[in-house]
Design a protein with these regions (language model features):
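P/S/T/G-enriched low-complexity
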Residues: 2, 37-521
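Short, mixed-charge, low-aromatic patches
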Residues: 6-11, 30-37, 194-196
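Short, solvent-exposed cationic patches
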Residues: 11, 19, 272-275
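N-terminal leader/signal peptides at the extreme start of proteins
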Residues: 1-12, 17
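Short glycine- and Lys/Arg-enriched binding-loop motifs that mark or flank ligand-binding interfaces
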Residues: 9, 27, 262
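Alpha-helical hydrophobic helix detector
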Residues: 17-34, 44, 48
Length: 521
């Protein structure tokens, strides 16, 4: 019995010795696990702060009047963001280092894509240990690295200066200048067209857009081309969109973020077409309309094939238009517009489009090209008559489809729009806008995002949703009521913003600029 008790005591002593010996190894292991867990949490917080700092730096690349100033803004923004989220002493850290030097924030151009800038951000900090310090390891240096990129933005503003915008012209100008003020001068390229009965190219996309167009931002305000806009006339929306996109197409920078921003307060009611046809002129046989050369329909309508060939290189010579042009000579094409009232106003113009040359300079009180009725036309003296027209083509001069059975119904006969009525022309204008949006988004060479601003309750929400390809409008009452909103998931998606009053215009343009800048990263 005593022998058994002594044996049990020996076993207990052995177990105690083993347990004590194990603690020698277990305590460091537990300490290592605690320290490692703490370091993991701190590193994750630090990494999140660095990632946020890199994104903040990329966002700030549009702040500053020069590229050097923009780089400085990016660096300072990165530092500010980092320390706001990971202040000195955070989590008992020591010697946290994040400065505006190139060592910690580096801004540089991409070596392949000249329209891409990168920001690399790096921060270090020493994190104290709790248990490992007893083994001679007082602290561990933690490093976090972040990266962000920003594509340059090429944007064209398409601004409605029709008569219905009259009292709101000033608010539109202010909103457009606020938009330009959000982008990176010297890197981004912005241009603008305005439209009524005709389309005016205020500026091709340029990196000097702030001095050319004008701007408003935290640095101040500057007047420019946008301040010369005066509002009067009809709504040639399809033509304006294509003139704007033509400038992006000619710029030919697919590595940039290419954007069209369309603002309108009305409904498209004007199409721009070529009335020449090899077998049948678009002018009725009884019409006395004269073309720009003073000839009647026997000479081929408003534009002869010879004058069609005057178009500068870059235009696809297919009649009806399927390409893009470098310029549009005044008086080349006839155009026709119909008001929304349903009772009045069809006019043909011989000076439908004017594109400003590089050397053309205007000051205030800009004189837009006059849209005059062609000599001899019955509608020159009676705007309610359609007697001059025999038919309309199914595409406009840019190749936009004016007949779309899935959107606005347009009747045809013999491959032409016929009979001609105000309802037909308005529907064709809607289809032209819709077609322009689709062709811009799906162009294989320079695809672009389309954004839109609808102003006042007279606007048609559906067509602006369709050209923007905005999925967020699908559940709205406007879309459910019309049943004609469409989203093409395989195409670039933009945003449609509705501005009910003049006070909503600046917020609407700011909202779009923020979304465009977000896409550029």
């Amino acid at each position: 019995m005593k022998s058994t008790l002594r044996h049990k005591h020996r076993e207990g002593g052995t177990a105690l010795m083993i347990a004590v010996s194990s603690l020698v190894f277990l305590i460091p292991l537990v300490g290592l696990a605690v320290d490692a867990g703490f370091l993991y949490v701190v590193k994750a917080r630090m990494q999140a702060s660095v990632d946020g700092a890199s994104l903040a730096a990329a966002r700030a690349l549009n702040l500053g009047q020069t590229t050097a100033a923009q780089a400085d803004s990016a660096k300072q923004n990165a530092v500010n963001w980092f320390y706001a989220n990971y202040p000195a002493g955070n989590w008992m850290s020591r010697n946290t280092t994040m400065t505006t030097s190139d060592t910690h924030v580096r801004v540089y151009d991409d070596t392949v894509n000249p329209n891409l800038r990168h920001v690399d951000v790096m921060a270090t900090s020493q994190i104290p240990t709790f248990f490992m310090k007893y083994l001679g390891v007082d602290a561990t240096t933690v490093q976090a690295i972040g990266h962000a990129s920003r594509r340059d933005v090429n944007a064209m503003l398409v601004l409605d200066r029709s008569g219905s915008m009259g009292s709101s012209c000033g608010a539109l100008i202010s909103a457009a200048k606020t938009f330009t003020g959000q982008f990176s001068a010297g890197r981004d390229k912005i241009g603008a067209v305005s439209f009524a009965d005709n389309v005016y190219l205020h500026s091709k996309p340029t990196s000097n857009f702030q001095s050319t167009l004008g701007y408003t931002n935290s640095y101040g305000t500057l007047n420019g081309e946008l301040d010369t806009i005066a509002c009067a006339g009809g709504t040639a929306t399809p033509q304006a969109i294509m003139v704007a996109y033509n400038e992006l197409y000619k710029l030919n920078q697919p590595g940039a973020l290419n954007v069209i921003v369309v603002e309108t307060d009305g409904r498209p009611n004007t199409i721009t077409v070529n009335f020449w046809d090899g077998s049948a002129a678009g002018i009725a046989s009884t019409s006395n309309c004269l073309d720009k050369n003073g000839k009647k329909k026997s000479a081929g309508g408003f534009a002869t094939l010879a004058s069609l060939r005057e178009w500068t290189p870059g235009y696809n010579m297919n009649v009806g238009g399927t390409g893009y042009m470098a310029n549009i000579p005044a008086g080349l094409v006839g155009g026709i517009g119909g008001t929304d009232s349903g009772t009045t106003a069809f006019l043909l113009f011989n000076s439908w489009t004017y594109v400003k040359t590089d050397t053309y300079n205007e000051t205030n009180n800009k004189q837009y090209p006059t849209s005059t009725a062609l000599s001899g036309c019955a509608m020159a003296s009676n705007r309610n008559t359609l007697a001059d027209l025999a038919w309309l083509p199914t595409t406009d001069i840019y190749g936009n489809n004016l007949v779309n059975g899935s959107y606005r119904a347009v009747s045809t006969s013999g491959g032409k729009i016929s009979p001609i009525s105000m309802t037909q022309i308005r529907a064709a204008a809607f289809n032209g806008v819709d077609s322009a949006g689709t062709r811009i988004r799906t162009n294989a060479t320079v695809p672009a995002h389309v954004f839109s601003v609808g102003f006042t309750t007279s606007v048609d929400h559906t067509v602006l949703q369709r050209i923007a390809n905005d999925p967020d409008w699908m559940g709205t009452s406007a879309c459910t009521t019309s049943g004609q909103c469409v989203v093409n998931s395989g195409q670039p998606q933009g945003t449609y913003v509705f501005a009910a009053t003049t006070a909503d215009l600046v917020p609407a343009f700011l909202s779009l600029s923020s979304q465009i800048l977000r896409l550029s990263r």
